[in-house]
């Protein structure tokens, strides 16, 4: 029998209340098959935002910065993880390729 392993990616909405920034994350939950790609999108409200980090929080651990991007860059890659930014549309996305079981975590974005 073939075993199908699913990678569960749980998402968290991060609101940057210090700067009054509202950030919305879509989808709220995501499940993909091992080896597939996953994309998580965030939209933000303040066009003055210039720093866009993504965090990963594994069960029982604190959040860890996994990748970030500045407003003067459209795309940044680090191994299987990439982030893209569209300042005009006010959204940025986290892309994870070739998902693995260790990718199962809570992911959240912020903007400042």
From Swiss-Prot:
Pfam families: V-set. It comes from the Eukaryota. Residues 1-20 form the signal peptide. Residues 21-112 form the Ig-like domain. It is found in: Cell membrane. Glycans are attached at residue 86. Disulfide bonds join 42-109. GO terms for biological process: adaptive immune response; response to bacterium. Keywords: Adaptive immunity, Cell membrane, Disulfide bond, Glycoprotein, Immunity, Immunoglobulin domain, Membrane, Receptor, Signal, T cell receptor. One of its GO terms (cellular component) is T cell receptor complex. Gene3D superfamilies: Immunoglobulins (2.60.40.10). V region of the variable domain of T cell receptor (TR) alpha chain that participates in the antigen recognition. Alpha-beta T cell receptors are antigen specific receptors which are essential to the immune response and are present on the cell surface of T lymphocytes. Recognize peptide-major histocompatibility (MH) (pMH) complexes that are displayed by antigen presenting cells (APC), a prerequisite for efficient T cell adaptive immunity against pathogens. Alpha-beta TR is a heterodimer composed of an alpha and beta chain; disulfide-linked. The alpha-beta TR is associated with the transmembrane signaling CD3 coreceptor proteins to form the TR-CD3 (TcR or TCR). The assembly of alpha-beta TR heterodimers with CD3 occurs in the endoplasmic reticulum where a single alpha-beta TR heterodimer associates with one CD3D-CD3E heterodimer, one CD3G-CD3E heterodimer and one CD247 homodimer forming a stable octameric structure. CD3D-CD3E and CD3G-CD3E heterodimers preferentially associate with TR alpha and TR beta chains, respectively. This is T cell receptor alpha variable 13-1.
